[in-house]
Amino acid sequence: ESCEIEAMVWCQGEADSTRLEWAEAYKTNLQHLFAATRADLGGEKLPILLVLSGDGKANPAMADAEIVRQAQRKVASADSQVTLVNADDLTLLDHVHYDAASQLKLGHRLAEAVLNRRN
């Protein structure tokens, strides 16, 4: 049997916010990752749900968070198959990872984004 992948979720970027060189390379790396994933899965139009990384305000190590966030916004703006999902209002356990209630909220937002793409 085979299956069809409805969408991909990408929720990463905080680690890249901790070093300027990584943050500056993030946009290009993200574009390459999305292109390679689509090529591997055989679908140029694979929808990707991109969760906006944290702003780093609660974590001084994430000094370059805004560079990563801007890269994410640019990738989503340039690719009609990428939907940016905001998580700024969710609660973090350790300055990076969401607590259980916020994981559920994010899951609902992601499901809603997939369903909205169908319509």
Predicted regions and their residues:
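Cell-envelope and extracellular/periplasmic
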Residues: 1-119
